[in-house]
Amino acid sequence: MNGTRRAFLGTALGVAAAAGVGTIPAAATESGPSRPIPPSGIGMHLYTMRTPLATDFRGTLERLAEIGYATVGVSGRHGNSAADIRRMLDETRLKAVLEHVAYDIVKGAGLPQALEDIHTLGGKWIVVPSLPGSLHSPAGYREAAREFNKAGLAARESGLKLLYHNHGTDHQVVNGVSLYDILLAETDPELVGFELDLYWAANGGAAAPGELFVRHPRRFPALHVKDMAPNGSFADVGSGVLDFPAMFDTARRGGVKQWLVEHDSPADPFASALASYTYLSRLRY
């Protein structure tokens, strides 16, 4: 670690401690919850870091590794090939677990190349980040479920698994039907899983994530751990109002393997990354 980065980490840790960020949650007392998140399961979804990645991809990965992150979810390559990113990941001792790939690619002729690229990255999941607005109806989500099953079969044949990442509108009830429930009910659990974004699930009025884990076991191998400020905006993990210990209590039943930090608009991406990592690494549930 060079002097500049050592100074950054030392200063940021001091700020986090002074603000109470990253301290052990009150619920995790000596007589309370004791389960930690495995260090290998704490990752960063790279959309959070898109601004520094655009100018210094490798340096950004290096700083994430120095903070303590073990894994990343790829979202935007910033002009790099999958092989380029894999080389930088190997050099910084980070592991990519997934990549976000647009719906039109996943259901089209670009799927084989996308699957090959995820193998190159070293990942295990291909993730559809959102659905087009034109599908925002029960009929549209049923169409998407059919496409997911087809793409999920191709993914399984290549040794990967297809996941879907939610936003708030996915949890809306249209004509008396929850759109997200359509995807859960009409996709094959052997072929399709879900990357549950905790902020958007809460923002969209979904059932508590812990309830989803119980109702749909082993369908949620990855999470986007994103916090909500009291005014509803985004917040560093641990600084907002979401009750992560309660959400994680049934995470094992949900099949959660990766807790990927995300903040859609951090004022300082590295300070946000540090504060969020510190909180998750100390969390007990």
Question: Predicted regions span which residues?
Answer:
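C-terminal segment of N-terminal export signals and the immediately downstream linker at the start
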Residues: T23-A54, E62-R63
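Acidic (Asp/Glu)-rich catalytic clusters
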Residues: P33-P38, L61-E66, N80-A96, G110-G123, ...
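Hydrophobic faces of well-ordered beta-strands that scaffold small-molecule active sites
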Residues: S40-H45, V72-V74, A96-V101, I126-V128, ...
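Active-site acidic/histidine proton-transfer and metal-coordination neighborhood
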Residues: H78, D104-G193
